[in-house]
């Protein structure tokens, strides 16, 4: 089983180095990169896997959330839409799920949060409750982090305070299904935000997004083709020891 780590690369004159993300590195490589991730080699022989192409599932969106035509942006609106009742739709907490359904393998995506003051981002099981008020926690099928009124939290039970050295303008979510690993990274400075304790996943997982009525802004999913940033994942070739 591989450990989970990401290395964010800055601009370089070396044509082999691009702005992006190196993920899923073995323990040996993590040790190499721990103190000087900016100078880490790329191992260009590794196979490449590109970021997941995530769009929003409008059928799951709370009536106060407006999903863009392309399905990449969700915006809070004060007046709820008049929508038919559906068991797929969140009817109390303003959430929306991604179309992507994951039951194996690895996936990552990036979300532009900008200067918003409040949001939740992460993953959840496809069968989580969507009616009424509920607590987001791994015990209830949610693995997410939260920004609320300037403070960052991991939605563990109880919640874990996250002291960040720099405010993220973009957040990277990285999932390794078989390893039971969910990690979050600040795509602004390349720093690690939080990794949930190892889980044993079962069933289908989906990207999760939440807005708050206290902050009427938008969340934008970056495209797999690099609409927000150039994201490239290198898979490991060395086994972790």
State the predicted function of each range.
Residues 1-241:
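Beta-rich ligand-recognition domains in immune and ubiquitin systems
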């Amino acid at each position: 089983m591989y450990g989970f780590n990401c290395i964010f690369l800055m601009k370089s004159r070396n044509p082999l180095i691009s702005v992006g993300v190196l993920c899923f590195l073995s323990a040996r490589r993590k040790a190499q990169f721990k103190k000087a991730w900016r100078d880490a080699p790329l191992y260009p022989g590794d196979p490449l896997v590109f970021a997941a192409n995530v769009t929003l599932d409008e059928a799951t969106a709370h009536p106060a959330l407006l999903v863009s035509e392309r399905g990449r942006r969700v915006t809070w609106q004060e007046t709820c839409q008049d929508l038919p009742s559906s068991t797929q739709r969140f009817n109390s907490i303003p959430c929306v799920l991604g179309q992507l359904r994951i039951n194996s393998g690895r996936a990552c995506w990036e979300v532009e949060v900008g200067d918003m003051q409040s949001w939740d981002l992460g993953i959840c099981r496809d069968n989580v409750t969507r009616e009424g008020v509920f607590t987001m926690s791994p015990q209830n099928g949610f693995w997410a982090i939260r920004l609320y009124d300037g403070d960052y939290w991991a939605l563990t039970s109880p919640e874990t305070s996250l002291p960040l050295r720099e405010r993220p303008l973009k957040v990277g979510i990285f999932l390794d299904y078989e390893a039971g690993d969910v990690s979050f990274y600040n795509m602004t400075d390349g720093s690690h935000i939080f990794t949930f304790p190892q889980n044993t996943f079962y069933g289908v997982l989906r990207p999760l997004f939440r807005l708050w009525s206290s902050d009427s802004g938008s969340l934008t999913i970056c495209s797999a083709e690099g609409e927000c940033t150039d994201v490239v994942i290198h898979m490991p070739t060395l086994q972790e020891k």
